[in-house]
Amino acid sequence: MSLNLNDKKAVVAEISAKVASAQTIVVAEYRGIQVGHLTQLRAKARDQGVYLRVLKNTLARRAVEGTAFASLASEMTGPLIYSISDDAVAAAKVISDFSKTNDKLVVKAGNYAGKPLDKAAVTALANIPSREVLLAQVLGMMLVPVASFTRGLAALAAKKAEGAEPVAAAAPAAESTEAAAE
């Protein structure tokens, strides 16, 4: 389907708006993927909050022109699907995970916060846990000293309680031995 000039301007404006708020863009070649698989990829992307779209490369180049993602323009050749995300790892994770199960989807390049990424860097970015998981891990690490301190206090209290009973029991025995000695 051919787009007229107004349609092209609308597409560039839409993509430019997405790119302006994005942290990560991942570009993948989708040559030979069946429509059903592409639909599954779109559903996974939608669930993760990732904007996924097949675009004309010239329109995509115009959309990233003058942004931190301009370095991707040199990689925009061939049939590409663009994955754009506000989350740092979501776009890379969706594309990378899907490419593991479908060898026809090939990660070509990416860009994170203005830094160009090659295929290996996109895969490494995809292996980073999500923001929520990282926050949970940090919180868990912060709670470890508190939990250790609490267990230490409980053990100390238990030890003192055990130590107090034998001393209290030994005191009447000592009194009885003193009374017997007199």
UniProtKB/Swiss-Prot annotation:
Record note on quaternary structure: Part of the ribosomal stalk of the 50S ribosomal subunit. The N-terminus interacts with L11 and the large rRNA to form the base of the stalk. The C-terminus forms an elongated spine to which L12 dimers bind in a sequential fashion forming a multimeric L10(L12)X complex.
A GO CC annotation given for this chain: large ribosomal subunit
UniProt GO MF annotations: large ribosomal subunit rRNA binding; structural constituent of ribosome
UniProt entry tagged with the keyword rRNA-binding: yes
Family in the record: Belongs to the universal ribosomal protein uL10 family.
Keyword set includes Glycosyltransferase: no
Pfam families the UniProt entry points to: Ribosomal_L10 (PF00466)
InterPro entries given in the database record: Ribosomal_uL10 (IPR001790), Ribosomal_uL10-like_sf (IPR043141), Ribosomal_uL10_bac (IPR022973), Ribosomal_uL10_bac_type (IPR047865), Ribosomal_uL10_CS_bac (IPR002363)
GO biological process: translation
Name assigned to this protein: Large ribosomal subunit protein uL10
Organism encoding this protein: Janthinobacterium sp. (strain Marseille) (Minibacterium massiliensis)
PANTHER family the record matches: 39S RIBOSOMAL PROTEIN L10, MITOCHONDRIAL
Keywords, in A-Z order: Ribonucleoprotein, Ribosomal protein, RNA-binding, rRNA-binding
Organism lineage: Bacteria, Pseudomonadati, Pseudomonadota, Betaproteobacteria, Burkholderiales
Function: Forms part of the ribosomal stalk, playing a central role in the interaction of the ribosome with GTP-bound translation factors.
